[in-house]
Amino acid sequence: MTLMDPLADAMATIKNNEMVGNKECVIEPASKLIGRVLKVMQEYGYIGSFEFIDDGRSGKFLVKLVGRINDCGVIKPRHPVKKDEWEYWEQRYLPARDFGLLIVTTPEGVMSHYEAKERGIGGRLLAYVY
């Protein structure tokens, strides 16, 4: 069986394990994009530590959960966002102002929408977490 969207599968795995109350989960297959998204989630305190496990194939991520996620998921299609449109997309995908975060990919790498706003750059929406 092939996966159509490994990032969507990873976010669903995190959400399901968080809802059940598990303290850790395994995300497979691993990719650079998933690793960068996990790093942004870790910076904002939505997950604890995570580590890459090399299994001889594509690898896995072992993620420690801290119980802060109410909902998370990917944004499809991956809308392009200009530097002055962040407010519109915050209202569309986040439940309240200054609550949660959008994860975006920009020419400068994967980051939160707060950081992209601060730097004055646009990008493409990848995921949301709150």
Curated annotation (Swiss-Prot):
The keyword RNA-binding applies. InterPro entries: Ribosomal_uS8 (IPR000630), Ribosomal_uS8_CS (IPR047863), Ribosomal_uS8_sf (IPR035987). GO terms for molecular function: rRNA binding; structural constituent of ribosome. Keywords: Ribonucleoprotein, Ribosomal protein, RNA-binding, rRNA-binding. Pfam families: Ribosomal_S8. One of the primary rRNA binding proteins, it binds directly to 16S rRNA central domain where it helps coordinate assembly of the platform of the 30S subunit. Part of the 30S ribosomal subunit. Belongs to the universal ribosomal protein uS8 family. This is Small ribosomal subunit protein uS8.
